[in-house]
Amino acid sequence: MKKLTILGSTGSIGTSTLEIVAAHPDRFQVIALTAGSNLELLKQQVEVFRPRLVSVLTADLARQLDRMLSDPKPEIHHGIPGLIAAATAGEADVVVAAIVGAAGLVPTAAAIKAGKDVALANKETLVTAGRIMMDLVRENGVRLYPVDSEHSAVFQSLEGQSGKDVKRIILTASGGPFLNLPLDRLSRVSVADALNHPNWSMGQKITIDSATMMNKGLEVIEARWLFDTPAERIAVNIHPQSIIHSMVEYVDGCVMAQLGVPDMKAPIAYALTYPERIPTGVKPLDLTALSGLTFLAPDYQRFPALKLAYDALAAGESMPAVMNAANEVAVEAFLKGKIGFTGIATSIARTMDAHEPHTLATIEDVLSSDLWAREKSRELIGLS
């Protein structure tokens, strides 16, 4: 039986992970859960899965949760120390890192240092601190299993192959809700429009990132570290049907691809059970029902955020961390109606222009760059 800690259990990835656990009680046991402020859902999860430890955002929320739960209660923690306690819980074999944004960096690093294998759904961990994190993975002899559908597809397409035989990695992207919208209308799209993803059901932040294609940019940077592949050998193709989740092209001209209906339970389950596979309840793919599979090159005029991600990766050092933090601030500002949709990429670019890249040697260096970028981005947007 595999014992799990789930960081971010009330989010989209966390709830899907627990659906898999519930479907296979003979294979999985939940040791620890963490959440932000969704106490009602966390309470339900605690009652069903009976973790030994839980953690929430603040001390006040921890007190509220304690009042909501009946005996026997788990240990209740809060804040960064609580996340670290969950990530390093002794019994856990695998830590599912599903916290959104840079907040997932510290607990994920703690899990790796504690010798835990990590099912990584938090792409910002490698975006902001890729070199540091991969060094930690090697030093501690643990495995990092990708949960993102695209990286899971690449991982599966690389199975049994030698890295020297890979010509390039091709990440696919749906193009989001604005793929065919006239460019002059992009500045006027609403939050509701941007949250209406055509294929995937996800949290708000990643859905906006998909609309700008920053999500794909983050995945390019993540792929650079996960698969030790330079940016010039990582391509992006827009594939509106989201059936082919990514591809690997080999030097002999052959291309290996992973296909399936858009459902995150499939890559989550593979990360949890590798190298085995288990039933997930995912709808079977019926190729005869498809009218066709189409592919397009990304248009940087429509999706400038993707170009910014490639630029950040080329600049290296602290720039990806700065870009990521600026994006988080800009997306939050858009969701709150403070800036327009096209203002997201503009704000990120201005923050990057104001930054001089420098070496990141420690997690603390990453967090310092992250903080600088958040403050600068808020200043440029006019939020501070």
UniProtKB/Swiss-Prot annotation:
Mn(2+) binds at residues 148, 150, 219. Pathway: Isoprenoid biosynthesis; isopentenyl diphosphate biosynthesis via DXP pathway; isopentenyl diphosphate from 1-deoxy-D-xylulose 5-phosphate: step 1/6. The lineage of its organism: Bacteria, Pseudomonadati, Thermodesulfobacteriota, Desulfuromonadia, Geobacterales. It catalyses: 2-C-methyl-D-erythritol 4-phosphate + NADP(+) = 1-deoxy-D-xylulose 5-phosphate + NADPH + H(+). GO terms for biological process: isopentenyl diphosphate biosynthetic process, methylerythritol 4-phosphate pathway involved in terpenoid biosynthetic process. Belongs to the DXR family. Its EC number is 1.1.1.267. Its cofactor is Mg(2+); Mn(2+). This is 1-deoxy-D-xylulose 5-phosphate reductoisomerase. NCBIfam families: Dxr, PRK12464.1. PANTHER family: 1-DEOXY-D-XYLULOSE 5-PHOSPHATE REDUCTOISOMERASE, 1-DEOXY-D-XYLULOSE 5-PHOSPHATE REDUCTOISOMERASE, CHLOROPLASTIC. It comes from Geobacter metallireducens (strain ATCC 53774 / DSM 7210 / GS-15). The gene is dxr. It comes from the Bacteria. Disulfide bonds: none annotated. Keywords: Isoprene biosynthesis, Manganese, Metal-binding, NADP, Oxidoreductase. The keyword Metal-binding applies. NADPH binds at residues 10-13, 36, 38, 122, 124, 203. InterPro entries: DXP_reductoisomerase, DXP_reductoisomerase_C, DXP_reductoisomerase_N, DXPR_C, DXPR_C_sf, NAD(P)-bd_dom_sf. Catalyzes the NADPH-dependent rearrangement and reduction of 1-deoxy-D-xylulose-5-phosphate (DXP) to 2-C-methyl-D-erythritol 4-phosphate (MEP). GO terms for molecular function: 1-deoxy-D-xylulose-5-phosphate reductoisomerase activity; manganese ion binding; NADPH binding. 1-deoxy-D-xylulose 5-phosphate binds at residues 123, 149-150, 174, 197, 210, 215-216, 219. The keyword Lipid biosynthesis does not apply.
